Every structure is written in C-alpha cells, then in structure tokens.
Amino acid sequence: MALVTGIGYIGIGVSDLPAWEEFAETIGFQIRERGEDGTLYLRMDKAHHRVAVHPTGEDDLTYVGWQVADENGFDELERTLRAAGVPVEMAGEDDAELRGVARLMRFEDPSGIKSEAYYGLVSEPEVPYVSPYAVDFVTEDQGFGHIVVMVDDYDETMRFYREVLGLQTSDLVKVGAGGVQTRMAFMRCNPRQHSLAFWAGDSTTRLNHFMLQTQTLDQTGMTLDRCFHGGIPATNLGRHVNDYAVSFYITTPSGFMIEYGWGVREVVSDYPVDKYRSVSIWGHRNLDGIHYTQALPPEAAESPAEQHLVEEPVAAAV
C-alpha cells in the first residue's frame, strides 16, 4: 500500500520569469499570488497552488510535494524513511505555511531529487478558481498530474519508490536505438495510471516533463490552438499506449516539456503490469524540429506511433 497518495504540487526553478507568467496563463493556469521573491504560484483548482515557479535560474525541477492522507500517515512515512536510512528534515511551521500545508518533511530520492511530503494542503473554496481560458483540470484524489524524470540508477530508483514510498508499477517500456536500450518505469499511487515515470540516463537536468490533464477534449484542443497561434513550440496530438491520454507536448520557456491532455485512464489496485515497445498508438509527431523528449535521437522515426515499423523502437516521453 502506498504511503503517499499523489503528487500534490511541484516547484520549478526558471531563468525567465516574465516569459513564464505569460506562458502559464496561455495554457490555462490562474496566477494566484506572487511571492516577495517573485515566485509565481499557479492555481489549477481550489488549492492555493499546484505549481510554484521560482526565479532561481536553474530551469529544472526544484522539488516534488508528495501528499499523504493525514497525520498518522505522515508519521508512518517518517518512520519508514528513517528505517530505510533516508535522512529526513522536519520542516518548521513557517516553511509549512509557505508551502500551504499543515505539516511538512523533506528528503531526497536516490538521485538527489528534492522531495517533500505533507498533509493538509490549503484549500480555498472561498476564492473561486478562475482560469483565464476556462480550463478545468483533473486533480482531487489524483494529484496535480504526473512527472517524468531522469535518474542515475534505474534499479535503485525502482526499489526506493516501490519499497519505501509504496508506489505500484503500472507498466514498463523498453525502447531503444542504435543498439542502446532504455528501460522506463511508470508508477502509481492513486487511480491515475501513473504519477511518476523515470528512466536512467545522462542529462544536465532532471525534469523531462510534467503532465496536466483537462476535463474535456475540447479544452486540450483549444489550448493547442492557442499555443500554435502564440508561437509556442508544440507537437501535434497523439495517444499513448499505456495511459491512453490524448495529448500534445509543449516546450516551456525553460526548455523542458509539459504534456497537456485528456482521457487518462484510471486503474485499480490489482491492475496487472504491462510491458510495451512503443510509446504512442498514433500521433505525437515533432513539428518544425521540436523534440519533446531528451531521449529522442536524430535517427528516430518521424512519429512515435511509427516505431513499430523500425527494428529498434525509439525512446520517448510518456
């Protein structure tokens, strides 16, 4: 059983805050607040924020906020982390208030990705969530969305998230090019088909992409139109093999991607693990040379959906 119930929020560090402010509104975020240091707090629902954009200059993932159900779950997670030899920092009230939670702890995964766990996310139903483009996101018991990260050691990362945090494996993907095989794992802790995905590889940054899910297909399609009209680099629509998302990938002002889509399937606890050799049923073509994954080599098929036509399928983000 998972000790965490979803990713409640993430923090990203950026080098171009004004560009992010315009970009965030284009894809439907409500800017809830601006911190004293310039941090943008982006809203997707009744929570105060789900994404914090910090002007750190690093253009990468800064932290991941894992939600636990209550104080008992919070204490159990602390004990489990310490028993596994993971250093834990218990944050004070001021830090918890800054994150908008009741209690907060900090730790790192095996690759050094800064992680936080909390319970009691601040909810503001008295302050209506108003997207500038009337976008409604799927959140609640499924968390804010999913993240895909690059890690140092695949097996060590798998053990940590499965044995310590208690995530379940939803599916595995093994793809490659030029004789180099890449293993990708997709893990869940709630009905969302995956909250976390990762593969091992060399990269100057950790974050490949994070995913936002809309309530309707039209909301996804209209956001794609706004990106095209606004000159924001994006792929076309496609559908993934594992979570069935109809989605597209956007290049953010920081260079990493956002997957933006609809129709992610929900799974139950006894869902069997699947293995795939491709990432998309159709679509997700790169447009104007835009690559939506750090792992996509030049010899890739034009579309991930065409990977079954080549001898060795090509790694791509899901």
Curated annotation (Swiss-Prot):
PROSITE patterns: EXTRADIOL_DIOXYGENAS, VOC. Fe cation binds at residues 146, 209, 259. Residues 6-120, 143-263 form the VOC domain. One of its GO terms (biological process) is xenobiotic catabolic process. Pfam families: BphC_D1 (PF22632), Glyoxalase (PF00903). Gene3D superfamilies: 2,3-Dihydroxybiphenyl 1,2-Dioxygenase, domain 1. Keywords: Aromatic hydrocarbons catabolism, Dioxygenase, Iron, Metal-binding, Oxidoreductase, Repeat. It comes from the Bacteria. One of its GO terms (molecular function) is ferrous iron binding. SUPFAM superfamilies: Glyoxalase/Bleomycin resistance protein/Dihydroxybiphenyl dioxygenase. Its EC number is 1.13.11.2. CDD domains: BphC1-RGP6_C_like, BphC1-RGP6_N_like. Its cofactor is Fe(2+). It is an enzyme of class 1 (oxidoreductase). InterPro entries: DiOHbiphenyl_dOase, Glyas_Bleomycin-R_OHBP_Dase, Glyas_Fos-R_dOase_dom, GlyoxalaseI/FosfomycinResist, VOC, Xdiol_ring_cleave_dOase_1/2. The keyword Transcription regulation does not apply. It catalyses: catechol + O2 = (2Z,4E)-2-hydroxy-6-oxohexa-2,4-dienoate + H(+). Belongs to the extradiol ring-cleavage dioxygenase family. NCBIfam families: 23dbph12diox. This is Metapyrocatechase. It comes from Rhodococcus rhodochrous.
